[in-house]
Every structure is written in C-alpha cells, then in structure tokens.
C-alpha cells in the first residue's frame, strides 16, 4: 500500500467495500464505507480483488470451485512455552547425535515442518515468544481424534514424537484455535473484461506458502501485463482470447502444482 501511494494511488484506511458491480467494458462501480461511516461510490475500468480467502468478487459471481482431488483441512493455534528446537532439552549434549549434526543456523528462529502419514505440521516463531503451531491433513489418509478442533490438533501433535517433546510444557493460547474444513479452491476464471482476482482471492492450494507465493507472483505479473495491454487500447477480441488462454493455462498450472 505504501508503494501504491508513492506511485500516486489514493489509499483509504480503514475502509470497507460494501458493494460492487461489474459492467465489463462499460466500467465498474465499487461502494466503499470509510472510517467516519460515509459511503463513497467510485467507478473504474478495472477492479482487482485482493481480499484473500474472503474472495468477495468470486463469491458474488459464484465462480469458486472446490479441489476434489486434494481434500485437506487445517487447524492451528498459538502456543506459549514451546521448547527450543536447538536446546539441550531437545537435541541433547552428544554432538554425534544425527539430530544435532550439520545444524548451522538457529532452527528456533525458522519455520520448521514435521511430517507424518497423511499430514504435515508447522512451527512458526512469533514476536513475544509465542509459536504458531498448525496441522494440515488429507482426510483420505487421516481422521484426527477428538471432539473439538483443539482436541484433534492435540491428538496428532501428541502422536508425533518430536512435536510431543517440543510441546511437553507448552500451553495453547485460550480462544486462539482456528479451523478450516476445506482448504483448497480454484476459480472458474481468474480474469475477464474489467476484473481480475489475485492472491488467495484467485484460489488457494495449501498453507505451505513457499510454492504458494510463487504461484501468486506468477498470477499477479501475468494479469498486470494484461490489464496494462487493455488500458493501452488492445483490441477487445484480442484481449478476450488472451484472457481465455490465461484462465485455461493458469488452472492447468495450479492443478499440476
């Protein structure tokens, strides 16, 4: 947002989009509620949806598609008192131990991943000493035990010897547990005349964001180029063909990804 403002964009914060209308080449309208409660309707040739999983544009269009071949869910919560992954409590004092060898950087300051049959777990250190701990699992391979999301998360964490050790004296932050029953989704279209969806608003694969951010970046750059071409006067029929090709190829890319 800072970069956008430096490039001449007018940034409203806080603000909330309360309605919008897509009218193709005739233009689009977006109604925004500002911090003081006033509502302003602006018109634009292009609307870019970057609302994350809220996916305002796609939900209004009805273009969201589930990924039936990748039935994953996730639970996550912040913990206090997680052990130091490089500390003696976990690593021990024997430098010949396979878990201690060849460790150059501090694992405590990095995102660490632990895997098991049908699932993977993340440990992400946060400011203030808390650690985000999350679970992603494939419902075809694993059904975590428990009645509540926290109980299900705890059952898997307790079943993994290393995460069980890491959380021996840790406590979850009360009221912080979150659950998503269906993680991945795609859109039937990512761009068309006058609108596009980017980032998680354009689809979501997995919380493993290392490849996920690559996919987002590819999509943003390609759609930016198409918007610039359209604004520079490229023929509508030519752009329509380009949009169709992009939608088909990007969906194939995400499916393969």
Could you say what each language-model-derived stretch is?
Residues 111, 117-121, 125-129, 141-257:
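FAD/FMN-dependent oxidoreductases across multiple families
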Residues 3-165, 220:
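Predominantly flavin-linked oxidoreductase catalytic cores and closely associated redox partners
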């Amino acid at each position: 947002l800072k970069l956008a403002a430096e490039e001449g964009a007018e940034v409203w914060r806080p603000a909330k989009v309360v309605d919008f209308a897509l009218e193709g080449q005739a233009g689009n309208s977006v109604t925004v509620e500002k911090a003081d409660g006033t509502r302003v309707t602006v018109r634009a040739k292009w609307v870019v949806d970057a609302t994350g999983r809220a996916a305002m544009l796609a939900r209004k269009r009805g273009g969201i598609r589930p990924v039936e071949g990748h039935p994953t869910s996730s639970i996550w919560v912040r913990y206090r008192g997680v052990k130091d992954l490089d500390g003696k409590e976990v690593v021990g004092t024997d430098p010949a131990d396979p878990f201690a060898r060849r460790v150059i950087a501090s694992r405590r300051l990095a995102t660490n991943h632990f895997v098991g049959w049908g699932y993977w777990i993340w440990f992400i250190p946060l400011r203030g000493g808390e650690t985000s701990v999350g679970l992603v699992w494939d419902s075809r391979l694993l059904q975590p035990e428990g009645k509540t999301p926290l109980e299900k998360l705890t059952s898997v964490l307790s079943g993994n010897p290393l995460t069980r050790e890491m959380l021996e004296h840790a406590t979850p932050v009360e009221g912080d547990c979150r659950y998503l029953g269906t993680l991945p989704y795609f859109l039937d279209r990512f761009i068309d005349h006058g609108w596009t969806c980017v980032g998680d608003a354009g689809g979501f694969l997995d919380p493993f964001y290392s490849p996920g951010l690559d996919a987002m970046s590819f999509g943003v750059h390609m759609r930016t180029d198409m918007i610039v071409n359209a604004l520079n006067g490229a023929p509508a029929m030519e752009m329509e063909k380009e949009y169709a090709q992009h939608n088909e190829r990007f969906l194939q890319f995400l499916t393969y990804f």
